[in-house]
Amino acid sequence: MTAAPTAGGVVTSGVGVAGVGVGLLGMFGPVRVVHVGWLLPLSGVHIELDRLGGFFMALTGAVAAPVGCYLIGYVRREHLGRVPMAVVPLFVAAMLLVPAAGSVTTFLLAWELMAIASLILVLSEHARPQVRSAGLWYAVMTQLGFIAILVGLVVLAAAGGSDRFAGLGAVCDGVRAAVFMLTLVGFGSKAGLVPLHAWLPRAHPEAPSPVSALMSAAMVNLGIYGIVRFDLQLLGPGPRWWGLALLAVGGTSALYGVLQASVAADLKRLLAYSTTENMGLITLALGAATLFADTGAYGPASIAAAAAMLHMIAHAAFKSLAFMAAGSVLAATGLRDLDLLGGLARRMPATTVFFGVAALGACGLPLGAGFVSEWLLVQSLIHAAPGHDPIVALTTPLAVGVVALATGLSVAAMTKAFGIGFLARPRSTQAEAAREAPASMRAGMAIAAGACLVLAVAPLLVAPMVRRAAATLPAAQAVKFTGLGAVVRLPAMSGSIAPGVIAAAVLAAALAVAVLARWRFRRRPAPARLPLWACGAADLTVRMQYTATSFAEPLQRVFGDVLRPDTDIEVTHTAESRYMAERITYRTAVADAIEQRLYTPVVGAVAAMAELLRRAHTGSVHRYLAYGALGVLIVLVVAR
């Protein structure tokens, strides 16, 4: 093993571990303030680490540590260049700096460093046209989001009379509303919320898999951090319509993301849309906390805030594991198309187990990392007594339905990804020749899988982090949250659940079934090995198996009005008769409907304007001087 990949991975893990340590100090210690005046003109760099910043710093570092270990073996297989290897730890450091920033200037600097570093990593394989297209989409979307954040925070700093977060004064309701909308657009773009998600299913599949894990499990969380820090903490507690806006954006993102994931055939694209779904659930929980607090239901508001924080931890664990497992499959086969995979359970058993753990966590079912957080969210919604408030009475049942439908569709999407991609027989020679990932890649996945199991059966271990992070929200400060332990109890709601007991019961039942099956097997005669019945055909072929496309076809048909699939059927008739078919070719593709209806017309209009500007480039110096003179006249008239 060469020194370069080892050094890059070790440095990335080291930066991640350091981030975890510093983040925990910020969460459980006093607020730490560091000011370095000479690093930036006029304002300097101002670091102020509190509980909320410490939570996100520790979470980011916890993702980076196993990804760095995974990176060592991944680089050996994929041969990343020196520039990406050097930028990965810088990307992690920039992400750690974002929640530590204590001033608007420092925050904007860290945010832009994070964006530039991630763009360089997305373009690691820039020789391919798909990568260049994804990089362009990501660059445009992230810079448009940055402009919205820049304008919003500059307006906030000017109205609040300070560049530092701690020194911001009260601002009028009009400024609060404007800053809320601008920052929701900017941070929502980074979090992949609908309709600002268009970059995510393009950039994540084309980026190297360790980078995809960092972006999807850590970077998108910082979009949520921006919403929490500025909209819900510094500007909060917000009015009722803020909560309704977050509920609407979160619910739409959750449903649209999981619908696209359920019909996606590209494994990494499926996981990218799953990120949009989970960011939507977190945003929905934050909106519920804001709405409930405005109506005086502080108990459900506190539980909803805790659900959002816990789900961020769970998503970071299972999504980093899922992208690392998908990267192992890609490195072993060169494929992301589920229709060409299969049979990996025998060839890559460890990777199969790891992806299964991640898929279970993404489903939100018992024994999965996301179960407890989604259970908390549902409990907060169904126990929010509406009283005489018609808004709460209308929105909470709808929100419960959104969470339930998103969970069901997520089960379908992850069942498809695991069953089609890893079980059955190989559908291509590449899948048949697959081999298990190297030890360092398996070690990184094992760490993330261990975190998923801990969150599934013992959320007690992260309870202090969740309590302290949730308590930073004004909506959750009126009630002390103490219900997250070995048994998750909600005293104000007469609800409880014991994930550890559920795990023990399932394990005991599985052992009992295994013992009974072994006992019955011993009493039976030895089974005979006979050819598998092929329904009258000569032999079974891989074409007779379900594919990802056929698995998703019922959902595609039910939600056709939303997904807008493009379907084409071509029938080739025999020479003897046009009533007899020799071949029937069925093609279907599901593009992003929002991208086609919203972004494609905008891109077309921009291209048309660019063509008009190109025609103005005639090469005539006299015409260029006339343009300049006209511009000067316009400036003089406007500035008069």
Swiss-Prot record:
GO terms for cellular component: plasma membrane. It is a multi-pass membrane protein. Pfam families: Proton_antipo_M. Signal peptide: none annotated. The chain crosses the membrane at residues 8-28, 52-72, 90-110, 136-156, 179-199, 208-228, 241-261, 277-297, 298-318, 352-372, 391-411, 446-466, 497-517, 619-639. Keywords: Cell membrane, Membrane, Oxidoreductase, Transmembrane, Transmembrane helix. InterPro entries: ComplexI-like_HydComp (IPR052175), NADH_UbQ_OxRdtase (IPR003918), ND/Mrp_TM (IPR001750). One of its GO terms (molecular function) is NADH dehydrogenase (ubiquinone) activity. GO terms for biological process: ATP synthesis coupled electron transport. It comes from the Bacteria. It is found in: Cell membrane. Its main location: membrane. Belongs to the complex I subunit 4 family. This is Uncharacterized protein MT0090. It comes from Mycobacterium tuberculosis (strain CDC 1551 / Oshkosh).
